[in-house]
């Protein structure tokens, strides 16, 4: 290993411009725009709206607003939108996250203008029809909410956010079973969310100048308005326990201020996912799982970034609750060990893994939650933030770990609660 490290420079090539993340940001007709050109025949156009569950006035409103996308507008029926896009070979999709609603069109680059006009039309001229709420939007949202509630791990992570942040980022993303927002609530929220200062347009694939010009042409009619506001995120903690007969989970959550390069590197150092197929990996959490339970349970770390906060999570899962309890204790011990005396090689490896994972999020033609959040953030999407990975040191990692451990973590236990631990038992 030492000889490999010494000879590593032989394998390195000169660093090139990071085209995968190099979006060109600008303001066009009051709209925030960012674009990159790629040597592909297809591209995408996304509208990233700051209207996720963090900003909603009542539970479920953001989810229903997202489901109204690509329904009837002032110019086209929902059927016409569907048929026209199918004839052009396009794909229309929507996502909702804790901070954003993302409307995306993927298409052959030659049809860029059609989709730029369609997305602007959806934002500016959606008709919120009562019958569509009753017959299409509500049923679709309820099905998606049911699927969410059937996924025990997703429910556990939602509970972890609730305990770590309480309100705002901690709000429930999907429509609660008992909620039924009115059409007037949705229309009122849309009128405040669909304004120029509250969304960004992201182009990936087509000619950047052409995409920018079309954005200026079609999005210019949208009202200016003021961005939606949310109270600053408050970091909290707590424990939640849910009985379940299925797979057991124990989730640890360490809330922190806005994501830093150190937090991304820390997440990679903890790891848990194997970098080589059919292996357990050599990260701290992989070793913890092997030591504590001979891999009868697994432990995986992940960092979820938001605009003014982030959540470092460690998820321990398996069928044996005793193995999970032992692995949770060993994983917590592994995290505490990083508060001092971290070997340089561990940090170098963590930096490389963190950069690979972070930059890979920008490679797909369509946006995901991480790339969307970073692109609309002036700090996390910049070259300065990316170069910050190379400045991470053992001392800076230790400082972050000490800060995370200064207050109790949030925990969620799902499964056999007679065996799964409490935080103070780790």
Swiss-Prot record:
SUPFAM superfamilies xrefs: LuxS/MPP-like metallohydrolase (SSF63411)
Record's GO cellular component terms: mitochondrial inner membrane; mitochondrion; respiratory chain complex III
Chief site of localization: mitochondrion
Presequence boundaries: 1-30
InterPro entries given in the database record: Metalloenz_LuxS/M16 (IPR011249), MPP/UQCRC_Complex (IPR050361), Pept_M16_N (IPR011765), Peptidase_M16_C (IPR007863)
Key words, A-Z: Electron transport, Membrane, Mitochondrion, Mitochondrion inner membrane, Respiratory chain, Transit peptide, Transport
Membrane topology summary: Peripheral membrane protein
Keyword Transport: yes
Listed GO MF terms: metal ion binding; structural molecule activity
Protein location: Mitochondrion inner membrane
Disulfide links within the chain: none
GO terms under biological process: mitochondrial electron transport, ubiquinol to cytochrome c; proton transmembrane transport
Assembly mode: Component of the ubiquinol-cytochrome c oxidoreductase (cytochrome b-c1 complex, complex III, CIII), a multisubunit enzyme composed of 3 respiratory subunits cytochrome b, cytochrome c1 and Rieske protein, 2 core protein subunits, and additional low-molecular weight protein subunits. The complex exists as an obligatory dimer and forms supercomplexes (SCs) in the inner mitochondrial membrane with cytochrome c oxidase (complex IV, CIV).
Role played: Component of the ubiquinol-cytochrome c oxidoreductase, a multisubunit transmembrane complex that is part of the mitochondrial electron transport chain which drives oxidative phosphorylation.
Family statement: Belongs to the peptidase M16 family. UQCRC2/QCR2 subfamily.
Stated name of the protein: Cytochrome b-c1 complex subunit 2, mitochondrial
Designated gene of the protein: qcr2
């Amino acid at each position: 290993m030492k000889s490999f490290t010494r000879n590593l420079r032989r394998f390195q090539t000169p660093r090139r411009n990071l085209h995968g993340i190099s979006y060109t940001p600008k303001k066009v007709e009051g709209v925030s725009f960012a674009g990159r050109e790629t040597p592909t025949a297809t591209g995408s156009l996304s509208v990233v709206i700051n209207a996720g569950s963090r900003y909603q006035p009542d539970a479920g409103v953001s989810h229903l607003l997202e489901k109204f996308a690509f329904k009837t507008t002032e110019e086209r029926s929902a059927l016409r939108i569907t048929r026209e896009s199918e004839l052009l070979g396009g794909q229309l999709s929507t996502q909702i996250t804790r901070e954003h609603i993302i409307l995306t069109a993927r298409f052959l680059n030659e049809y860029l203008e059609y989709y730029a006009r369609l997305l602007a039309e959806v934002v500016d001229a959606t008709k919120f029809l009562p019958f569509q709420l009753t017959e299409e939007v509500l049923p679709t949202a309820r099905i998606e909410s049911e699927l969410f509630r059937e996924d025990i791990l997703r429910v556990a992570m939602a509970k972890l956010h609730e305990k770590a942040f309480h309100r705002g980022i901690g709000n429930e993303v999907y429509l609660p079973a008992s909620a039924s927002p009115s059409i007037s609530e949705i229309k009122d929220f849309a009128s405040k969310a669909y304004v120029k200062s509250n969304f960004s347009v992201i182009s990936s694939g087509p000619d950047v100048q052409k995409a920018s010009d079309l954005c200026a042409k079609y999005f210019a009619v949208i009202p200016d308005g003021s961005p939606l506001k949310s109270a600053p995120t408050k970091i909290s903690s707590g424990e939640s326990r849910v009985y379940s007969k299925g797979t057991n989970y124990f989730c640890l959550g360490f809330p922190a201020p806005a994501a830093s390069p150190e937090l991304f590197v820390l997440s990679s150092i903890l790891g848990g996912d194997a970098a080589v197929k059919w292996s357990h990996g050599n990260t701290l959490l992989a070793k913890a799982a092997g030591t504590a339970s001979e891999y009868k349970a697994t432990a995986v770390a992940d960092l979820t970034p938001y605009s003014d906060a982030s959540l470092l999570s460690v998820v321990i899962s398996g069928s044996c609750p005793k193995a999970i309890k032992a692995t949770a204790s060993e994983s917590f011990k592994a995290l505490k060990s990083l508060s001092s005396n971290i070997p340089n090689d561990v940090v170098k490896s963590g930096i490389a893994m963190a950069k690979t994972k972070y930059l890979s999020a920008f490679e797909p033609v369509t946006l995901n939650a991480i790339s969307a959040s970073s692109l609309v953030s002036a700090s996390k999407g910049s070259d300065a933030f990316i170069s910050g990975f190379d400045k991470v040191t053992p001392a800076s990692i230790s400082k972050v770990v000490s800060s995370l451990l200064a207050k109790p973590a949030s925990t969620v236990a799902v499964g056999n609660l007679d065996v799964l631990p409490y935080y103070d038992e780790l």
